[in-house]
């Protein structure tokens, strides 16, 4: 049975969790994922040769054969290939000790990791684990990255939508489907109804941009107007039958809600 480490443990607890194995070497557990294994001996070599050493070790541990046999073997192969892409995208060039007389490029992230003893121990610990444990570590790291992105909130690109030319009143109107645009141009639109729905959506999504707005609408023309408003505001709308009635659901595709500077009702009045 695998016992997970506490991902929120402080530096003192992490140091206490580290074990000393015969030979005086410490083993560091992978934080929040897996228990520690006895670390393997690593020669003190240059960063570039250490990289080659880890690559060779990864190939040996991946059980490479002409045709991988079994699910575990395939899983270990996929995990190893994923990790080796870190080296392929690193961009570091060989140094003078490898026969290159040109000045060495600045070390990349992978090269720096190879020269850090703590990272070396974690790398060896990872490569000595089974395919299932490696997959578990990768899933943990991926989930951690997603949770950090959610905690950071909306990106700057979304905050610049007010100045983005794609969000001018004219471009917002072009987002409306051709059929709905034709109806808005040819029909006599009840502006009071249009303004009422605009006010409801503005009030709702300004307070809860990630919530879902629902409304029961039996009037087909009113549903059409609501769809047009949603497309103009870059919202997502859908209607479905619910107990013999039509229910509208509206949601926001962005993390925050930034309505156009000119609402649809005002834009239509300008065009008339």
Swiss-Prot record:
InterPro entries, per database record: R3H-assoc_dom, R3H_dom, R3H_dom_sf, R3HDM4
Organism annotation: Bos taurus (Bovine)
Biased composition (Basic and acidic residues): 155-165
Lineage: Eukaryota, Metazoa, Chordata, Craniata, Vertebrata
Domain R3H: 191-254
Keywords: Nucleus
Organism superkingdom: Eukaryota
Entry keyword annotation includes Nucleus: yes
Protein name per the record: R3H domain-containing protein 4
């Amino acid at each position: 049975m695998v016992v997970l480490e506490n991902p929120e443990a402080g530096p003192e607890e992490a140091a206490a969790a580290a074990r000393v194995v015969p030979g005086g070497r410490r083993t560091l557990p992978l934080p929040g994922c897996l228990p520690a294994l006895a670390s393997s001996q690593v020669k003190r070599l240059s960063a570039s040769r250490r990289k080659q050493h880890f690559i060779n070790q990864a190939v040996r541990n991946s059980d490479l054969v002409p045709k991988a046999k079994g699910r575990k073997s395939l899983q270990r192969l996929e995990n190893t290939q994923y990790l080796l892409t870190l080296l392929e995208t690193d961009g570091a060039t060989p140094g003078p000790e490898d026969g290159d007389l040109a000045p060495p490029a600045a070390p990349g992230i992978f090269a720096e990791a190879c020269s850090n003893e703590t990272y070396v121990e974690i790398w060896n610990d990872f490569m000595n684990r089974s395919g299932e444990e490696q997959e578990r570590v990768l899933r943990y790291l991926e989930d951690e990255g997603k949770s950090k992105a959610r905690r950071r909130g909306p990106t700057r690109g979304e905050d610049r939508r007010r100045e983005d030319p794609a969000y001018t009143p004219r471009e917002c109107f072009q987002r409306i489907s051709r059929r709905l645009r034709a109806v808005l141009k040819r029909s006599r639109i009840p502006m009071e109804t249009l303004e009422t729905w605009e006010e409801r959506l503005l009030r709702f999504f300004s307070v809860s941009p990630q919530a879902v707005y629902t409304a029961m609408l039996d009037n087909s023309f009113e549903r059409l107007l609501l769809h047009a408003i949603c497309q103009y505001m870059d919202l997502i709308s859908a209607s479905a039958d619910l107990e013999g009635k039509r229910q509208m659901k509206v949601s926001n595709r962005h993390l925050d809600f930034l309505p156009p500077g000119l609402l649809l009702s005002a834009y239509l009045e300008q065009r008339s």
